[in-house]
Amino acid sequence: MLAEPKLVALFLLVAVECLSLSASTIEVTEPAGAAHGYPGLCDINGKKLADGEFRQWIENKRLHVVITYKFSDGDVYEEQAQFQQQPALTQEKWSWKESKNGASQREFAADFLSGMASAHIRKDNKDVSKKIDVEPGRTFAGFGFSIALSNLRKRLLGGEQVQLKAVGFSPFPSLTPQVVTVTTSYGGLDRMRMSGRLLKGDRFIIHPELSIIAKLFVNVPDTKIWLTNPAPAGFLRWEGPIMLPDDPIIRVDLLSGAKSGPAEPEVR
């Protein structure tokens, strides 16, 4: 007689664990495919600094993203990322490289499969690598958050706040790879001038959840990402530090132009 209740309890426990697992990952509601674009990188005041090229494609059942920014003085920034979209959105690789006239200046990378992250800054002669705690399907870096938000859009528009993990690098006390909890939320509908056009976008906020002690030593600004409105939700604008928390805050626009305007609340 005792076996049946125990069996039922075991079944319920397994069911709850399965539900918890599925709830912690991001269901792909907006599958990404082949795309090619030419974004612009600006300072926070909208002055254009670099021409960009965005490439995205599917290969070996993986989504690949390469974004390159070329500056007039010979600087080149390049971001690369790889994702799995089934059974849930999962980032597998990410890297960011800054070079000048072909020579590497700064490099940051994270292998989500092995759990290793690394950083290199040439001028400071710093090279670090560290094992990081990756939660598959919940840990992202760089453009990965734009893809994650496009699939979380309906939930966030409905008022839900979703916590994810972000791979970052702290300059204090040393150049250390870290995984930080971030809260994603909806900030409102904005309009912004871009490449001579007035466009609308939904603003989403990525807020780092730092401990009180950490806040005493480092200030990590929120990152803002705008997705196109109305749906389907595609990338429109990104604002945040280049890489480290104390880096200059920059803006990346979907459409490249000589001048980029600030985002302002849409008057309904």
Where are these regions (language model features)?
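Bacterial N-terminal signal peptides
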Residues: A9-S20
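Surface-exposed beta-loop interaction hotspot
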Residues: R122-L164
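Small/flexible residues
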Residues: V8, F108, D124, I132, ...
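Short N-terminal alpha-helical targeting/association segments
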Residues: A9, V28, G142-F145
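Acidic, serine/threonine-rich low-complexity disordered tracts
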Residues: S24-S114, Q163-R268
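Bacterial N-terminal signal peptides that target proteins for export
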Residues: M1-A9
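Mixed-charge (acidic/basic) macromolecular-recognition segments
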Residues: G115-A119
